[in-house]
Amino acid sequence: MSMLFYTLITAFLIGIQAEPHSESNVPAGHTIPQAHWTKLQHSLDTALRRARSAPAAAIAARVAGQTRNITVDPRLFKKRRLRSPRVLFSTQPPREAADTQDLDFEVGGAAPFNRTHRSKRSSSHPIFHRGEFSVCDSVSVWVGDKTTATDIKGKEVMVLGEVNINNSVFKQYFFETKCRDPNPVDSGCRGIDSKHWNSYCTTTHTFVKALTMDGKQAAWRFIRIDTACVCVLSRKAVRRA
């Protein structure tokens, strides 16, 4: 019985050694697999090829029924290209920033996984000097209940509210700025000559990197958030006598 077993093993090894290998199944830059490579090694090579052809933004984070169960590798937040001063992952709600001057401090100190290093502004520098007023009034808040957003392709996507990082639940916050009132004065924007100009305040947007759902995986996407309040002007038609 043992002799038959050894004979079968020998025949199996000879068959594997004689089997031809196709170079088309080998990733670029690698040599042809040796005869002693097993099917497991072959499957690993296939997985590597698929990973190299996949988009760089995809994250290997599986969904287990609910978004709060998604586990994310903290090393992903060390990539500089994924950082945004308006996106914050924190275990506790960030303090309410009175204006965008406080934005750097909030992002740099509240979340260890997406810190940004930017030049420090003087805390004693006032936003407006005496006698100066803003053309439009804006309000800035940290938004922590965003569930959907519009991506850079114009499609509506689901935003991850919470992720698990090192066995701690981090919530995803967005620092958004929008207009308090489209018409801060009766004529529109403040300080505009209403005799010659029509004016109104409107909220503008920008795109930031955020963790969103992509099928059954978490993925980085550019999503649109409110970031500023600006004055829109149009010249009034001149009436000719």
Swiss-Prot record:
Originating organism: Homo sapiens (Human)
Key words of the record: Cleavage on pair of basic residues, Disease variant, Disulfide bond, Endosome, Glycoprotein, Growth factor, Lipid-binding, Metalloenzyme inhibitor, Metalloprotease inhibitor, Neurodegeneration, Neuropathy, Protease inhibitor, Secreted, Signal
Signal peptide interval: 1-18
Subunit structure of this chain's protein: Homodimer. The homodimer interacts with a single NTRK1 chain. The homodimer interacts with a single NGFR chain. The NGF dimer interacts with a single SORCS2 chain (via extracellular domain). The NGF precursor (proNGF) binds to a receptor complex formed by SORT1 and NGFR, which leads to NGF endocytosis. Both mature NGF and the immature NGF precursor (proNGF) interact with SORCS2 and with the heterodimer formed by SORCS2 and NGFR (via extracellular domains). The NGF precursor (proNGF) has much higher affinity for SORCS2 than mature NGF.
Record GO biological process: axon extension; cell surface receptor protein tyrosine kinase signaling pathway; circadian rhythm; extrinsic apoptotic signaling pathway in absence of ligand; extrinsic apoptotic signaling pathway via death domain receptors; modulation of chemical synaptic transmission; negative regulation of cell population proliferation; negative regulation of neuron apoptotic process
Disulfide bonds: C136-C201, C179-C229, C189-C231
Coiled-coil region list: none
GO molecular function: growth factor activity; lipid binding; metalloendopeptidase inhibitor activity; nerve growth factor receptor binding; transmembrane receptor protein tyrosine kinase activator activity
Binding site for a 1-acyl-sn-glycero-3-phospho-L-serine: K209
Pfam families according to UniProt: NGF (PF00243)
Residues that, per the record, bind a 1-acyl-sn-glycero-3-phospho-(1D-myo-inositol): Y173, K209
UniProt-annotated location(s): Secreted; Endosome lumen
This protein's record includes keyword Protein biosynthesis: no
Superkingdom, natural source: Eukaryota
Glycosylation sites: N69, N114
Disease: Neuropathy, hereditary sensory and autonomic, 5: A form of hereditary sensory and autonomic neuropathy, a genetically and clinically heterogeneous group of disorders characterized by degeneration of dorsal root and autonomic ganglion cells, and by sensory and/or autonomic abnormalities. HSAN5 patients manifest loss of pain perception and impaired temperature sensitivity, ulcers, and in some cases self-mutilation. The autonomic involvement is variable.
UniProt xrefs under SUPFAM superfamilies: Cystine-knot cytokines (SSF57501)
Classification via InterPro entries: Cystine-knot_cytokine, Nerve_growth_factor-like, Nerve_growth_factor-rel, Nerve_growth_factor_bsu, Nerve_growth_factor_bsu_mml, Nerve_growth_factor_CS
Protein name as it appears in the record: Beta-nerve growth factor
Assigned GO CC terms: axon; cytosol; dendrite; endosome lumen; extracellular region; extracellular space; Golgi lumen; synaptic vesicle
Organism taxonomic ancestry: Eukaryota, Metazoa, Chordata, Craniata, Vertebrata
Maturation-removed propeptide residues: 19-121
Family: Belongs to the NGF-beta family.
Function: Nerve growth factor is important for the development and maintenance of the sympathetic and sensory nervous systems. Extracellular ligand for the NTRK1 and NGFR receptors, activates cellular signaling cascades to regulate neuronal proliferation, differentiation and survival. The immature NGF precursor (proNGF) functions as a ligand for the heterodimeric receptor formed by SORCS2 and NGFR, and activates cellular signaling cascades that lead to inactivation of RAC1 and/or RAC2, reorganization of the actin cytoskeleton and neuronal growth cone collapse.
